[in-house]
């Protein structure tokens, strides 16, 4: 009560001082202060105090998201040689045939509009660094990793090694495991999603293209059973194995293992097949529009975010481990990659236990 009286008294004193000043000026112009002006001033001060009380403090996650945004901008502003050195310092594994790096968030494999640094563009510089600056050194991309996805990326030192790795991937002999935080809990908690994916045009105020499901079965009109339909000629077979590792507060930590390599496959299967979009997936959380992901109030509260700030949430999809069969008679190669800090912070905020280290 005493604090409230002091605040009220201080407010009255400020108002009185303001009124006194107004009266001084008014006396020079022979006009009196208007009651409406005083009431308006009091109203504005009251609204300001209310806004101050309702202001949401910046959470550790939001701070990390801001840092991540700045880091992404810095990666695109540095000289390519500096960028290449940063990638080399992030290397996870290296031998005479391949090098595995930890791909940063928001870095594309190939040049796109408005992006200065990409993995492909810096390969010549990175090759020289890995080969003690010898002229003619080369590195080759072995597989795809989306711009917003972090984690293990395999590069080959020769064309022969690149072709070998690509052949292994195409023949489904390479084990790739991802970790994702999903909005929602997949049911059942584990299984295999075998639904082809096709690119579709989205019409409306924001026309664009997205990958979509192209099921091989449809529900009968009477609701009794399903009927197999002919596969669309432009659809791609897409198979994903998934397992929920833990869940709480309406969110889940899910391990994903793609058995095929279709564009946006994991994101499409989670969002459209299981209706559990990946946290930070602003593309597939809505179908008919391009807009920031809308999160439940409980999730926002745990993450320490407001809905207007979700547009800055990164995609929480991480390439955690790749296992390559032995090259030329050597033993299998297992490359693991630690989670990025923003991913760990999100798990902590959601009170989801961190996965065991591999």
Swiss-Prot record:
GO cellular component assignments: mitochondrial matrix; nucleus
Keywords: Cytoplasm, Isomerase, Mitochondrion, mRNA processing, mRNA splicing, Nucleus, rRNA processing, Transit peptide, tRNA processing
EC main group: isomerase
Gene Ontology molecular-function annotations: RNA binding; tRNA pseudouridine synthase activity
Chain segment of the transit peptide: 1-12
Residues of the signal peptide: none
Stored Pfam families: PseudoU_synth_2
Catalytically driven reaction(s): uridine in 5S rRNA = pseudouridine in 5S rRNA; a uridine in tRNA = a pseudouridine in tRNA; a uridine in mRNA = a pseudouridine in mRNA
Places the protein is found: Mitochondrion matrix; Nucleus; Cytoplasm
Main location: mitochondrion
Biological process annotations from GO: mRNA processing; pseudouridine synthesis; RNA splicing; rRNA processing; tRNA processing
Gene3D superfamilies: Pseudouridine synthase
The EC number(s) this enzyme carries: 5.4.99.-
SUPFAM superfamilies in the cross-refs: Pseudouridine synthase
Task of the protein: Catalyzes uridine to pseudouridine isomerization (pseudouridylation) of different mitochondrial RNA substrates. Acts on position 1397 in 16S mitochondrial ribosomal RNA (16S mt-rRNA). This modification is required for the assembly of 16S mt-rRNA into a functional mitochondrial ribosome. Acts on position 39 in mitochondrial tRNA(Phe). Also catalyzes pseudouridylation of mRNAs in nucleus: acts as a regulator of pre-mRNA splicing by mediating pseudouridylation of pre-mRNAs at locations associated with alternatively spliced regions.
Family: Belongs to the pseudouridine synthase RluA family.
Name this protein carries in UniProt: Pseudouridylate synthase RPUSD4, mitochondrial
Source species of the chain: Danio rerio (Zebrafish)
């Amino acid at each position: 009560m005493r604090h409230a009286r002091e605040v009220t008294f201080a407010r009255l004193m400020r108002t009185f001082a303001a009124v006194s000043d107004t009266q001084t000026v008014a006396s020079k112009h022979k006009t009196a202060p208007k009651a409406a002006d005083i009431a308006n001033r009091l109203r504005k001060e009251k609204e300001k105090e209310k806004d101050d009380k309702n202001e949401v403090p910046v959470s550790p996650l939001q701070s990390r998201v801001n840092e991540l945004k700045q880091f992404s901008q810095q990666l695109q502003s540095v000289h390519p040689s500096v960028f290449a050195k940063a990638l080399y310092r992030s290397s996870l594994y290296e031998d005479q045939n391949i090098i595995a790096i930890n791909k940063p968030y928001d870095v594309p494999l190939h040049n796109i509009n408005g992006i200065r640094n990409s993995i492909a563009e810096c390969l010549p510089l990175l090759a020289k660094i890995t080969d003690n600056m010898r002229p003619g050194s080369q590195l080759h991309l072995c597989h795809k990793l989306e711009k917003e996805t972090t984690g293990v990326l395999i590069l080959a030192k020769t064309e022969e090694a690149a072709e070998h790795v690509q052949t292994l991937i195409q023949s489904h002999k390479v084990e790739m495991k991802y970790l994702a935080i999903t909005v929602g809990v997949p049911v059942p908690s584990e299984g295999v999603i075998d639904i082809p994916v096709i690119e579709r045009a989205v019409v409306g105020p924001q026309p664009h293209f997205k990958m979509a499901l192209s099921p091989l079965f449809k529900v009968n009109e009477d609701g009794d059973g399903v009927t197999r339909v002919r596969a669309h000629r432009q659809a791609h077979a897409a198979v994903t194995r998934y397992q929920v590792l833990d869940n709480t507060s309406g969110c889940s930590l899910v391990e994903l293992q793609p058995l095929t390599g279709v564009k946006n496959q994991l994101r499409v299967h989670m969002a459209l097949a299981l209706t559990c979009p990946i946290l930070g997936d602003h593309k597939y959380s809505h179908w008919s529009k391009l807009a920031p992901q809308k999160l439940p109030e409980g999730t926002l509260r745990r993450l320490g975010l407001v809905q207007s700030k979700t547009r800055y949430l990164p995609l929480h999809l991480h390439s955690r481990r790749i296992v390559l069969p032995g090259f030329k008679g050597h033993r299998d190669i297992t490359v693991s990659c630690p989670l990025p800090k923003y991913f760990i912070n999100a798990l902590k905020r959601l009170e989801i236990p961190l996965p065991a280290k591999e």
